[in-house]
């Protein structure tokens, strides 16, 4: 019964996708003049690249429906540990780890039961072969000395350059982990080399998902489970602006838009960094059309002063992701621990022991993580102890929960995820097409003079927008100055109060240093929490103020445009952008880590100064902060030296924090405001373009106008049917999802 229902739903999804493709082809070929008429052909506002992208989206959904394939896109920066996370999910090392971007091209990793050894298929290799020929000529002509100035040439890069000079092409098939690593590393080095030699890498040739490399391997966590209808595939996406390639952002957006679900990998230690912010923006751009999950990697670096799991979930759900994800879909983990633990358990189960560390370096990493820094080679022979240590490390990694809640669920319901993805894509397409076509159809019924008036009114709105942007910049700058002045005043108050409290700690020379250390830690932690809370509230208020200022400026323009178009009979089938908060959310510990100068302890300072610095190091989450030439403890300690050193660090912290604060707020607000005004102007320009094209069509002879009216009305009606049927399909799929939970 369940299988029959899936089949019927997939048939309905395929019918709607095919119908949408046909309608899109009609839009492409829709005649704008009668045969034999000399009137020029006029371009639709849906430009050719725009229509081609929609074709690609529909074709991709058809491909996924035919295989009932659920594609889980994984997005994150290199520093977030994306490759390690994928290896942990798969259960074996299928992607190489290097301290540089490793995903220049998207890569599919498909769960293939029984495929123990990974195999990579790279059928669309022709564009790479052409690139190699171009690079071969450039390498012959280039100055190697200049090349070394703009490119880091390590042994892998030298091997690649030698390979290019010899004309060795890429294969279409690679079997085994090491050949796959070599292929993927070479592809990423190829991107770096092409950039250094000023040769365009053929990214556009790999925009279609069927052209990108595919790794087939059995996921260890899914091995032995019963088979289900459908197929689970991971999509490793390029991080935004990885390897200095800004256009990878567009490729990332395209791949995310075509996924069935999205898994974001964020760095626990850098949750509010610029790089992670770019990832969050890319995810938010996908909207609510696909399910979203978050893995917060490197949670093993949490200390007792850091946010706990619940605090991290609340921060990401409410503040960073603006309510687009629930806390239940956020999983703090250690991907490295998860990968190492599972790799060790797999080796023990299949081979009865771990391989020698000198042959496979991951064993050394595992021993260090599971057994501690003082492990010895002899420890690896105690299999029962190693097995227990691997189980403990797996438990500590917290990876079991996302494996169960995400991977197992995705595998069991891959067919439903594929169908739901198709339904949401159909709804988005039909809604956008219907709004556009309805606007065009009504434009043929409006008098030419009225259309000219609408065009002129939007031109005036564009000019007013530019004028208001210049005026509002001054007001926003004033608000920022007020906020920063107030923040700096508060910071100085905290600085003075903290120094007074620190001085009080060192009044009694007879008090044990361990007691001073404990009280010092408490004092510093309290100060940090106070500053963090105040800055959070203070800049939330600034965010609200900026939103109000911009809304007061923009709303009259928006209302005027909508009113004038409504008077002409146009439905509000267009959407103006909304300004979102752009003021950064501050992590005091992270700011301290970024701006404080590392100062070495001198020979004259006692090791007890190192103890106080250690207090700071734990506060800053920097284990080696301030460590220098420490000597053995002496019998006498000058507490005044300790107090002055600590006070100096507090002064430096507050000074540098004020500077970073000003830079980040100014940069963030300026960028956000410019983006907002640019998007608003773009929306007005698009409206103006639609009206101009409606006017041009309206000026054709009556027979052309009538023909266009008939065609547009029929197409609007058909897209209305597609939308209604897609809603019913989505509801039926959701009913099945609900039934699966019980």
Swiss-Prot record:
Known partners and oligomeric status: Forms homooligomers. Binds to the beta sliding clamp processivity factor (DnaN) in the presence and absence of DNA, may bind to the clamp itself as homodimers or trimers. Homooligomers may be able to bind more than 1 clamp complex.
Protein's recorded name: Clamp-binding protein CrfC
Function: Important for the colocalization of sister nascent DNA strands after replication fork passage during DNA replication, and for positioning and subsequent partitioning of sister chromosomes. Does not have GTPase activity on its own.
Pfam families per record: Dynamin_N
Sequence segments annotated as region (G5 motif): 331-334
Keywords: Chromosome partition, Coiled coil, Cytoplasm, DNA replication
GO CC list: bacterial nucleoid; cytoplasm
Effect of deleting the gene: A small proportion of anucleate cells, disrupts nucleoid positioning, leads to premature separation of sister replication forks.
Residue span, Dynamin-type G domain: 66-402
């Amino acid at each position: 019964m369940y299988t029959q229902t899936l089949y019927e739903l997939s048939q309905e999804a395929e019918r709607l996708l095919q119908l949408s493709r046909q309608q899109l082809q009609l839009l492409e070929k829709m005649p704008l003049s009668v045969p034999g008429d000399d009137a020029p052909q006029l371009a639709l506002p849906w430009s050719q690249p725009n229509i081609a992208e929609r074709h690609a989206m529909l074709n991709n959904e058809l491909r996924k429906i035919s295989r009932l394939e659920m594609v889980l896109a994984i997005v994150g920066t290199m520093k977030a540990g994306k490759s390690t996370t994928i290896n942990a999910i798969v259960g074996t090392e299928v992607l190489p780890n290097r301290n540089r971007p490793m995903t220049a091209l998207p890569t599919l990793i498909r769960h293939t039961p029984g495929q123990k050894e990974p195999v990579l298929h790279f059928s669309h290799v022709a564009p790479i072969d052409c690139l190699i020929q171009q690079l071969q000529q450039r390498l012959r002509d280039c100055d190697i000395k200049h090349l070394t100035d703009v490119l880091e040439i390590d042994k892998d890069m030298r091997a690649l350059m030698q390979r290019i000079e010899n004309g060795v092409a890429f294969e279409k098939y690679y079997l085994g982990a090491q050949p796959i690593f070599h292929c993927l590393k070479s592809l990423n080095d190829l991107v770096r080399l092409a950039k250094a030699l000023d040769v365009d890498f053929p990214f556009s040739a790999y925009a279609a998902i069927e052209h990108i490399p595919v790794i087939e391997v059995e996921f260890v966590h899914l091995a032995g489970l019963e088979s289900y209808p459908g197929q689970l595939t991971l999509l490793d996406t390029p991080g935004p602006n990885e390897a200095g390639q800004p256009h990878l952002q567009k490729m990332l957006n395209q791949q995310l838009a075509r996924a069935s679900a999205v898994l974001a990998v964020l760095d626990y230690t850098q949750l509010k960094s610029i790089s992670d912010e770019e990832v969050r923006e890319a995810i938010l751009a996908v909207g609510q059309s696909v399910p979203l999950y978050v893995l917060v990697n490197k949670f093993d670096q949490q200390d007792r002063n850091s946010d706990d799991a619940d605090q991290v979930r609340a921060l990401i759900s409410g503040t960073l992701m603006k309510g687009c994800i629930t806390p239940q879909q956020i999983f703090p983990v250690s991907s490295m621990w998860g990968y190492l633990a599972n790799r060790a358990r797999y080796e023990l189960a299949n081979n009865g022991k771990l391989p020698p560390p000198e042959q496979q370096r991951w064993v050394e990493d595992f021993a260090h993580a599971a057994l501690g820094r003082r492990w010895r080679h002899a420890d690896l022979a105690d299999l029962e102890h190693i097995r227990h240590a691997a189980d403990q490390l797996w438990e500590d990694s917290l990876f079991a929960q996302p494996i169960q809640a995400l991977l197992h669920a995705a595998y069991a319901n891959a067919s439903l995820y594929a169908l739901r993805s198709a339904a949401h894509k159909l709804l988005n397409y039909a809604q956008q097409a219907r709004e556009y076509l309805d606007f065009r159809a009504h434009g043929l019924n409006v008098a030419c003079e009225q259309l000219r008036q609408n065009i002129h009114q939007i031109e005036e709105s564009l000019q007013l927008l530019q004028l208001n942007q210049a005026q509002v910049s001054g007001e926003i700058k004033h608000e920022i100055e007020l906020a920063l002045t107030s923040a700096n005043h508060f910071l100085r108050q905290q600085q003075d109060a903290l120094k007074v409290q620190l001085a009080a700690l060192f009044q009694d020379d007879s008090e044990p240093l361990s007691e001073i250390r404990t009280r010092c830690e408490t004092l510093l932690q309290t100060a940090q929490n106070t500053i963090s809370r105040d800055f959070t509230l203070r800049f939330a208020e600034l965010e609200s103020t900026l939103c109000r200022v911009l809304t007061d400026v923009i709303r009259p323009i928006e209302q005027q445009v909508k009113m004038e178009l409504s008077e002409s009979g146009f439905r509000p089938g267009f959407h103006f952008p909304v300004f979102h908060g752009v003021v950064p959310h501050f992590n005091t510990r992270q700011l301290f880590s970024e701006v404080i100068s590392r100062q070495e302890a001198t020979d004259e300072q006692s090791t007890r100064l190192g103890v106080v610095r250690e207090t700071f190091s734990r506060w800053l989450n920097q284990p080696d902060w301030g460590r220098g030439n420490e000597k053995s403890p002496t019998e006498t300690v000058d507490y005044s030296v300790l107090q002055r050193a600590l006070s100096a660090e507090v002064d430096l912290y507050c000074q540098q924090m004020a500077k970073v604060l000003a830079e980040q707020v100014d940069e963030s607000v300026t960028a956000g405001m410019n983006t907002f005004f640019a998007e608003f102007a773009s929306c007005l320009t698009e409206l103006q373009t639609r009206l101009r094209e409606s006017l041009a069509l309206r000026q054709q002879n009556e027979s052309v106008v009538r023909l266009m009216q008939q065609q547009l009305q029929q197409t609007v009606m058909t897209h209305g049917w597609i939308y209604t049927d897609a809603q019913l399909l989505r509801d039926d799929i959701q009913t099945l999802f609900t039934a699966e939970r019980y």
